[in-house]
């Protein structure tokens, strides 16, 4: 029999020490990885609940196991809230991740060998948008569009020309490193012109979309998929939304289960339900507005300090800094900033001359620092400190000074107060 006072501490000290160290790192370091955020204690409470014990293959009311009456309530809540939050006719909350959500969409809409048109990973797309090393580029015939080299913006004329030439079965609109708005209406017009499905991967901007501060893809797309973390600030997981098409919805359900997954993670689905309820609040809308303001403030400082920001700025939660002009690798910049307790990720920039393991850029995002309570003033200061380090990459005194400034601001803005 288990007792409620069973703890990891004292039982598995190696693991407990690592968990404690990670909590301290999160509190003492500034997090600027665009795909990371902090979940609320409510979300973590759901994830740590007894719902993790329940197997529930199938869907609410149509399970393959008994005893699902209460987890059915949790999943029904998550589905209803997702549909309300995004104004969608259909929601599947079972995908374990964004990549598995995307995989299910491919499986539902395509046959092996069908042509897909997606954004090049080298220009800001995602592995699951047709990269050759991913299932999406191995099982399907992938054609890639990119950014205009002069403007740093998506070239919709190129997208249309490629669509007309290759006649894809599905066009993917979405990104992992693009700082501007997407024209979903134009994407849909192109898809309709060639008889393709439009699939939108809004994993990075779902929270912004929910708050009405980024264009809404749901009215334009046949299918939308997203993660539930990142800007949405929920548990790590996936979500699929779709239009009012019963046949399409059945295909999507079958592609998730039994096509790609077995039992859903009911504790994570409960956490998704919590996340969606949090996202309906006025506080969440204000948070998303601040995320965008903070990203713009940081990008402005980098530009003022002489750094090239890809696409000329940002209209969402992230931006890319090109370090080609400074002859600094993304790998070295990442390491130097990390020493100062500023966590970013090295990232390829369009037409990057260096390998993906080295890169010539940094991807910077503001969801996590905004959760801490940073506003424009703190973000401008932070961007200035980062520029100081990048301008003096080998100067330990500069790095040490910035680390002290980081420690002070983190103490003022704790993650979990």
From Swiss-Prot:
Catalyzes the reversible interconversion of serine and glycine with tetrahydrofolate (THF) serving as the one-carbon carrier. This reaction serves as the major source of one-carbon groups required for the biosynthesis of purines, thymidylate, methionine, and other important biomolecules. Also exhibits THF-independent aldolase activity toward beta-hydroxyamino acids, producing glycine and aldehydes, via a retro-aldol mechanism. GO terms for cellular component: cytosol. Homodimer. Pathway: One-carbon metabolism; tetrahydrofolate interconversion; Amino-acid biosynthesis; glycine biosynthesis; glycine from L-serine: step 1/1. Belongs to the SHMT family. Its EC number is 2.1.2.1. Keywords: Amino-acid biosynthesis, Cytoplasm, One-carbon metabolism, Pyridoxal phosphate, Transferase. It holds the Pfam family SHMT. The modification N6-(pyridoxal phosphate)lysine is found at residue 230. It catalyses: (6R)-5,10-methylene-5,6,7,8-tetrahydrofolate + glycine + H2O = (6S)-5,6,7,8-tetrahydrofolate + L-serine. Its cofactor is pyridoxal 5'-phosphate. It is an enzyme of class 2 (transferase). (6S)-5,6,7,8-tetrahydrofolate binds at residues 121, 125-127, 355-357. One of its GO terms (molecular function) is pyridoxal phosphate binding. InterPro entries: PyrdxlP-dep_Trfase, PyrdxlP-dep_Trfase_major, PyrdxlP-dep_Trfase_small, Ser_HO-MeTrfase, Ser_HO-MeTrfase-like, Ser_HO-MeTrfase_PLP_BS, SHMT-like_dom. PANTHER family: SERINE HYDROXYMETHYLTRANSFERASE. The gene is glyA. This is Serine hydroxymethyltransferase. The record marks 229 as: Plays an important role in substrate specificity.
């Amino acid at each position: 029999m288990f007792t409620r006072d069973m703890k990891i501490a004292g039982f598995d000290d190696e693991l407990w020490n690592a968990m404690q160290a990670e909590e301290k790192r999160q509190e003492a370091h500034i997090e600027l990885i665009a795909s990371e955020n902090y979940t609320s204690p409510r979300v973590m409470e759901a994830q740590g609940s007894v719902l993790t014990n329940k197997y529930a293959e199938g869907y609410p009311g149509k399970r393959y196991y008994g005893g699902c009456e209460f987890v059915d309530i949790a999943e029904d809540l998550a589905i209803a809230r997702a549909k309300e939050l995004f104004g969608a006719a259909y929601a599947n909350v079972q995908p374990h991740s964004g990549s598995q959500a995307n995989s299910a969409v491919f499986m539902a809409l395509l046959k092996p060998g069908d042509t897909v048109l997606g954004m090049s990973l080298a220009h800001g797309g995602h592995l699951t948008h047709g990269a050759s090393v991913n299932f999406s580029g191995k099982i399907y015939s992938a054609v890639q569009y990119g950014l205009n080299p002069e403007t740093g913006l998506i070239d919709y004329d190129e997208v249309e020309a490629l669509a007309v030439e290759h006649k894809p079965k599905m066009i993917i609109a979405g990104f992992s490193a693009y700082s501007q708005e997407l024209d979903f209406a134009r994407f849909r017009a192109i898809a309709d012109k060639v008889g393709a499905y439009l699939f939108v991967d809004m994993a990075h901007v779902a929270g912004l979309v929910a708050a009405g501060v980024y264009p809404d893809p749901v009215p334009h797309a046949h299918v939308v998929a997203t993660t539930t973390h990142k800007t949405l600030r929920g548990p790590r997981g996936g979500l699929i939304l779709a239009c009012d098409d019963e046949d399409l919805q059945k295909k999507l359900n079958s592609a998730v289960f039994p096509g790609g997954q077995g039992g859903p993670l009911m504790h994570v689905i409960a956490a998704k339900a919590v996340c969606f309820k949090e996202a309906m609040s006025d506080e969440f809308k204000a948070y998303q507005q601040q995320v965008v303001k903070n990203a713009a403030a940081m990008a402005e400082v980098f530009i003022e300090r002489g750094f090239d920001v890809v696409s000329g700025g940002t209209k969402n939660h992230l931006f890319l800094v090109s370090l080609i002009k400074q002859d600094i690798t993304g790998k070295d910049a990442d390491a130097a900033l990390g020493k100062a307790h500023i966590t970013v990720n090295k990232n390829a920039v369009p037409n990057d001359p260096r390998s993906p393991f080295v890169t010539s850029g940094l991807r910077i995002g503001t969801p996590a620092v905004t959760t801490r309570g940073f506003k424009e003033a703190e973000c401008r200061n932070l961007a200035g400190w980062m520029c100081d380090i990048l301008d003096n990459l080998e100067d330990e005194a500069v790095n040490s000074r910035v680390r002290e400034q980081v420690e002070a601001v983190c103490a003022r803005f704790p993650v979990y107060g």
